[in-house]
Regions:
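N-terminal hydrophobic/helix-forming segments and targeting peptides
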Residues: 1-456
């Protein structure tokens, strides 16, 4: 089903399945606006399907369902296959971090009767898109006594929202002469928290009132910002988009749409696979996949090591064989073709909404710099599988040559000598506070990922 519009094949029964699946996805997306929430919600979904931590198993056998969590920001789950791990795994890997605005460690200040939060944006954003929209605050505050306070402000209907102001058009003559990259600077992305002074305070009374509210509601003080991790994200739930309800608008489709569909493909398995099936959800992709929770961390290989150790006698050669024989889909989104900005695409090699799961044989920029370039033999295997399963799919590049580019986690796992190719959902308005995906593509990704887990 190559380059066909998926909507055309759905009968009424299948259309209901498409819409129902997307309702569950919308719930996950709305509830998973940070990496920590994405992981905790993944754990809930997995446990509801019978997955358990490794400690719950004395010795794993085919069909067992096991999961790992790393530092509350990575999630890995496995369905043990009938073949030994050294024969390789079938892995779906996505990232659960999204572009956002982070709160600095010493952030709270008052200026001219406004209480403001100083911030530092995370990932590649068009900064001007983040002003004058309702924003929410999510994260954790870790106190010296070891307690951890969960913060969520802005999505409960009874909550206030916060935001970042912009200059009125009437006084914007100088601002309008700036380039889009400079019209809002990084240091301008400070969040307004309040304007009401605390009675009896003479200095920084508005800031004092905000601190009073935080103390009463969350029991933390200004000094606790030093050990806090607070993220500013768009407020509000994901929504149906378009009069025909054919699309989903929401924050964080990149890459939680692939994270959710990959997760569901594994946890919904109701049979013992030939090869162990795996879903791995990683952090820090938007800033280079670095650190203990990024794809470059050793944690993923460590989990395979733990499985080998549980099921047999561990050795380095067993781990290397398992990795080398593994086949993986780097489940990441692709740039959707937008007719309003058609000039950035090669139309023959673009990702179209509604045409199904999108493969990127290679990513990178300019002369394929930083690319993972998948083996054509591997792509041929996948083509044959998806055609036999009736899954709609397409291939694309990330725009015209020299127009720009981007990368994924694919090359990192490719460095382990796995077979890896990027496969995900086409997204409009990528990295904006509101991104758009087709419900058909979400469903076809789920079906494609399920089929991949059976690849011989």
């Amino acid at each position: 089903m190559y380059r066909k519009n998926a909507w055309e094949k759905y009968d009424e029964e299948t259309l209901e399945l498409v819409m129902s699946f997307n309702e569950s996805y919308k719930q996950y997306l709305s509830a998973s606006k940070t990496e920590r929430l994405a992981v905790s919600n993944a754990v809930k979904l997995a446990e509801a399907k019978g997955f358990k931590p490794l400690e719950a198993y004395e010795k794993l056998v085919p069909g067992d369902k096991v999961y790992f969590v790393n530092k509350k920001k990575n999630f890995v789950c496995y369905v043990i296959g009938s073949e030994p791990l050294e024969a390789g795994l079938r892995v779906l890997g996505a990232h659960i971090d999204s572009p956002r605005i982070d709160v600095k460690q010493d952030p709270l200040y008052e200026r001219d009767n406004f209480a403001l939060l100083d911030t530092h944006y995370y990932g590649g954003i068009k900064k001007y898109q983040w002003v004058t929209i309702p924003l929410a605050i999510y994260g954790v505050v870790c106190k010296k006594d070891g307690s951890v306070i969960d913060v969520a402000i802005g999505d409960d209907p009874t909550d206030p929202v916060v935001g970042i102001s912009d200059l009125l058009i009437h006084l914007s003559a100088d601002q309008m002469q700036k380039s889009a990259a400079k019209v809002i600077e990084g240091e301008d992305l400070d969040v307004t928290l309040g304007s009401m002074p605390l009675k009896g305070e003479e200095k920084n009374a508005v800031k004092a009132n905000v601190l009073r509210i935080l103390k009463e509601k969350y029991d933390f003080e200004e000094a606790d910002f030093v050990s806090a991790e607070l993220e500013i994200v768009p407020a509000g739930p994901s929504r149906d988009y378009g009069l025909d309800r054919s699309m989903v608008a929401g924050y964080g489709h990149d890459d939680r749409v692939c994270a959710y569909t990959s997760l569901r493909a594994v946890i919904d398995m109701d049979f013992v696979p030939t090869y162990t099936a795996c879903c791995v959800l990683v952090d820090k992709e938007e800033v280079g996949s670095i650190g203990a929770t990024g794809a470059q961390s050793k944690f993923f290989a460590d989990t395979i090591m733990y499985l080998i150790d549980n099921m047999s006698t561990y050795s380095e050669i067993k781990l290397r064989k398992a990795l080398t024989n593994t086949k993986m889909l780097s489940s990441d989104v692709s740039a959707g073709y937008d007719p309003l900005f058609a000039y950035v695409n090669d139309s023959k090699n673009a990702a179209y909404l509604g045409h199904g799961l999108c493969f990127n044989k290679y990513t990178g920029s300019r002369g394929k710099s930083g690319a993972n370039d998948a083996m054509p033999e591997y792509m041929a295997e996948i083509r044959n599988l998806l055609d036999s399963c009736g899954v709609n799919y397409q291939t694309a590049e990330l725009g015209k040559v020299d127009q720009g580019g981007g990368g994924t986690i694919a090359y990192i796992l490719g460095n382990e000598n796995m077979y890896v190719i990027d496969a995900g959902v086409a997204v409009l308005c990528m990295h904006a506070p509101m991104e758009i995906v087709s419900k058909a593509d979400v469903y076809e990704a789920y079906q494609g990922y399920k089929a991949f887990l059976t690849l011989e």
